[in-house]
Amino acid sequence: MLLSLSNYGKSIKVPREQYSSPYSVEYSFTIDDLVGDIVDSPRGAVSIQAAIPYDEWYSSKTLSRYGSWGPRSRHYSKPSAMDSWSVEKCRERVIAVGLLFKGYPYQHHHIPDWEHPESWPWKPVSSGKRGKGLDCSNFTSFVYNLAFGLKFTSDVSKQSAIGDATGPGPGTNKWIVKRIPLPEKYEDQIKVLRTGDLVFSFKKGSKSIGHAFIWVGRIGKSPDDTPLFLDSGGGATPDCNGIYVPDGVYLRPYRKKYWPYTHVSHAIRFFYSKENRKNLSTE
């Protein structure tokens, strides 16, 4: 174990495989209701994550076109039962789909299960290892795509400015999203944010957007009642037990003195009213 200092006192780093998160989620729906159509169907297959066939993932053409990022994501179809889902079910599905990738490392990739061949270029990350994984905005983009067939840019700066997403499913349909200004006060932000919102923070010392994460909201459970978010981030956040959350996809605490809050910009909401989409209740 490696001891180090954080903003919250002494915290401990442990290997990823030894980390046990104190955070959890309690859904209003069963896991099967939320993600059964993914885990029990071809939709959840690793081999179809990319826009190109699986046997081309590691081809010289892919190397030439995408370099260290690997192939881009496919555009998933609209889930067959989506029109019957409530706002709350859609919001909770965002979290449930995101947590299917819990423990995936932080990597600058377009899809979660693509791994660098040793001979390919690699953009170094905090984990210091090659392997599968996603960075923050490729994670948020992939989650909404897999969950609903809603596709939007994975560039974090451009993602923070979207007014719509393409979908559900491939084609020309557009899904209008809502930009949510966030109050300055921490407690007021908690009241405004909703489960599944995309939230964006500025880079430290800059007015450029540097991070994207997903708000967990009321379904998040923390021993100290700290609100939670879900992201693919670096390993610089200690949990409530003083253990650093590893880099990659994990639940993390939204603390007053932590960068995502101190540098927060705004949120984007995908599910919010009947005007937003048919058959969804208002809130």
What do these predicted regions represent?
Residues 1-7:
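Hydrophobic h-region of N-terminal signal peptides that target proteins for export
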Residues 9-11:
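Boundary at the C-terminal end of the N-terminal hydrophobic targeting segment
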Residues 13-155, 279-283:
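N-terminal capping segments
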Residues 30, 50-53, 62, 155, ...:
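Short, solvent-exposed coil/turn linker segments
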Residues 84, 88-103, 107-122, 175-187, ...:
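Mature, folded catalytic cores of secreted/periplasmic enzymes
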Residues 103, 144-145, 204, 218, ...:
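Residue-level marker of positions within ordered structural domains that often coincide
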Residues 150-243:
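...with weaker cross-activation on analogous glycine-rich loops/strands in unrelated enzymes
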Residues 228, 232, 244-283:
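Low-complexity, Gly/Ser/Thr/Pro-rich intrinsically disordered linker/tail segments
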